[in-house]
Curated annotation (Swiss-Prot):
Its EC number is 2.5.1.60. Catalyzes the transfer of a geranylgeranyl moiety from geranylgeranyl diphosphate to both cysteines of Rab proteins with the C-terminal sequence -CCXX, CXXX, -XCCX and -XCXC, such as RABA1A, RABA2A, RABF2A and RABG2. In vitro, can prenylate PGGTI targets with the C-terminal sequence Cys-aliphatic-aliphatic-X (CaaX) with leucine in the terminal position. Substrates with the C-terminal sequence -CSIL such as ARAC11/ROP1 or GG2/AGG2 are prenylated independently of REP and when the beta subunit is associated with the alpha subunit RGTA1. Required for male fertility and root tip growth. Geranylgeranyl diphosphate binds at residues 179-181, 222-225, 231-234. It comes from Arabidopsis thaliana. One of its GO terms (biological process) is root development. SUPFAM superfamilies: Terpenoid cyclases/Protein prenyltransferases. This is Geranylgeranyl transferase type-2 subunit beta 2.
């Protein structure tokens, strides 16, 4: 059992993983199409640990820009198709390095705005899949770029609210099951647009705090599922945004995250004794940030970027 965050080993794990991306390792091959997301997870973890300077800014930024398409959207890697998922990660990475100025903001924002549907929802790409994840991504990305006026915000918000369920949660579409990941997306989008008053905070807060497993202290994403470190982000961030985070046992959740670390080689897994990956490493450290763990920089619960980065963007003309 772990009693502290082994930040130095997580740093080494992430840097080794990034070095492997240049080789034909198994993990680099299976994650090739979503490398942009992996880069965001790894780099944001480094930023939260105050170690972003450990990577080559020029190398990362140059690679990110090779993933942009003529449409303005970004792909998960060079040679792949653009999607809003990867576009947000690309924008977030550039924000980390204070390089948003190299973007053709008009082009990127037009790409995102062009994916809004008549009912206010958003498609993820030209193939038309609709999901509240994409609503959050569009709103978050356009807010960072200061281009929310490019879309019909009222319709976007009304669509998100139409995905609210009787249990207070939100699903991926109207009538779909409540899920912590979708709840983060919907609550995050409502927070960014100033519409949190449309959330039943007590009802949703109860549903979210019920996600904590009594024995392990970990959180799950929906009823009758195993606890998973990634929900330390999805559930906690939502609770913070609706001011109900005091409804869970924070100390038990901290222990669950710390116990999910690989104490020898670094990295964090979905639960204790499982295999680590960059996805859970990021969400574990981000969860500790939300829990105000010592030595971890503060992350914004709506934008999923360090608070100092968001302050620099939103309070700079």
């Amino acid at each position: 059992m772990a009693d502290k965050l082994v930040a130095g080993k997580h740093l080494r794990y992430i840097l080794n993983l990034m070095a492997e991306k240049k080789k034909e390792s198994f993990e680099s091959v299976v994650m090739d199409h979503l490398r942009m997301n992996g880069a965001y997870w790894g780099l944001t973890t480094l930023a939260l640990l105050d170690k972003l300077g450990s990577v080559s800014e020029d190398e990362v930024v140059s690679w990110v820009m090779t993933c942009q398409h003529e449409s303005g959207g970004f792909a998960g890697n060079t040679g792949h198709d653009p999607h809003v998922l990867y576009t947000l990660s690309a924008v977030q990475i550039l924000a980390l390095f204070d390089k948003l100025n190299i973007l053709d903001v008009e082009k990127v924002s037009n790409y995102i705005a062009g994916l809004q549907n008549e009912d206010g929802s958003f498609s993820g790409d030209i193939w038309g899949e609709v999901d509240t994840r994409f609503s959050y991504i569009a709103i978050c990305c356009l807010s960072i770029l200061k281009c929310l006026d490019k879309i019909n915000v009222k319709k976007a918000v009304d669509y998100i609210v139409s995905c609210k369920n009787l249990d207070g949660g939100f699903g991926c579409s109207p009538g779909a099951e409540s899920h912590a990941g979708q709840i983060f997306c919907c609550v995050g989008a409502l927070a960014i647009t100033g519409n949190l008053h449309r959330v039943d905070k007590d009802l949703l807060g109860w549903w979210l705090c019920e996600r904590q497993d009594y024995e392990s202290g970990g959180l799950n994403g929906r009823p009758e599922k195993l606890p998973d470190v990634c929900y330390s982000w999805w559930v906690l961030s939502s609770l913070i945004m609706i001011d109900r985070v005091h409804w869970i046992e924070k100390a038990k959740l901290v222990k669950f995250i710390l116990d999910s670390q690989d104490m020898d080689n670094g990295g964090i897994s979905d639960r204790p004794s499982y295999t680590v990956d960059i996805f859970h490493t990021y969400f574990g450290v981000a969860g500790l940030s939300l829990l105000e763990y010592p030595g971890v920089k503060t992350i914004d619960p709506a934008y999923a970027l360090p608070v100092h980065v968001i302050n620099r963007i939103l309070f700079t003309k």
